[in-house]
Each structure stands twice: as structure tokens, then as C-alpha cells.
């Protein structure tokens, strides 16, 4: 399997830490070049330095992906340094809580709703809008959107804005798969369950334990397990797979 992505450029948003980093490192390990976009400027610069020290071709760009002009600048910078991308992973996502709790509709400030929609949904349109012209011209491309099991079934540990945006990504995935198919560009989505990321360390242990107990495999997933599924969608092995949503959830909230 080594070298599946030799000389291919993959752009990953929300790529500093957790699932995003696992995806970037998966591409790099198999010969790819990694465009890393994240809001964490200090962490991103250190991450890029570490990747380059290990001999990888990587380019970090600090950006607020809720703003189109910053997405555009990031895409252009990565294209200039690494070449145009044939793989785009829209991984970025936020799920705000207040005192560790997801707010109900009557409690949620409209600004919070707007911010989640901007980051989780608008950014996916922006990045896909920017990346697909090259893919269409080359008749080669992979777009992978990071949805969630919360976009497929009710999940009481997230708020409505997160569920709505992740469900929206499923709709975009299917629509774009139909639009781009004749150009040999595939569009698929992943729907992770509870994944053991650094962010989960801020969640009370009893919540994660409860999720593990109602998951068929009786454990949380790892970022690397999500990355493995992402790399499959991005690979030539998935060239005849498009418009699909793959749960990576260990049997939690099976749909």
C-alpha cells in the first residue's frame, strides 16, 4: 500500500491535532504532499516544522475558514508551494458547549448558531469551490467531507447547530457527487462516532464511558481509524465509489 499518494497534493482543513493530523500524516506516509489549514497559528507552525524535519513536504497556512477570502489565500499559498490539490478533506468542525452542556434551541445565542454554520458548512463550500476547478480540468479528484453520526441520527450530547451542519454535509456530498461525477471527481463523506482526540479529554470521563457502553465494539475510536477510512476514499481503490457516507463509529448510532 506504500506510495498510494506519491506526489499528490492533499489539503486538509482543521488539520492541527486529532483526526486532521492523523489524516495529514497518513497521506504523507504514503508519498503525498500535505496542505495543512488551521486556525491554530502557533501549533500549526510547530506542526509544519516537525513534519518537514521528518522529511515530508508540508505547508501550513493559518486561516479562519469561515471567511472566503482567507480560504482563497490559503488555497493559493498551498498551490504555489506544493502544487494544485487533487485531494481535499473538509475536516474542520466545531461543537460549542456552555459549561460542558449543549444548549437547547431557546437558550442558544443566534451568533453561536451563525458561527457554527460558518465554520462547519460554509467553509466546506468555500474550499470545494476553490479546489474543484483544477480537479475538473484534470478529470481527477477526491473530495472527502467530515460529517458525523450526529448528522444521521439524534445524538443528545451535541447541539442542533452541529447536527444540522453535519446533516447538511451529507446533502452536499450527494449533490456534488452527482455534479462532479462526469468529470471523474468523487465526493464522499465520513461519519465518525466518538473518537478519542485531545478535545475529548475536556469532557467528563463518565460521558465518554457511557458512549463506549452503547457502542457495539465497547470502546471509542482513534483518529488513525478515521484516517484509514479517509485514505480509502482518497485512493484509487475507491475510484468507483461516490456519493457515499461511511460510519466510522464502532457500531454507535447505527443507521
Model segments located where?
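Residue(s) in the substrate-gating loop at a strand-loop-helix junction
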Residues: 148
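Short, small/polar-rich loop/turn modules that mediate ligand/substrate recognition or access, typified
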Residues: 181, 186, 241-243
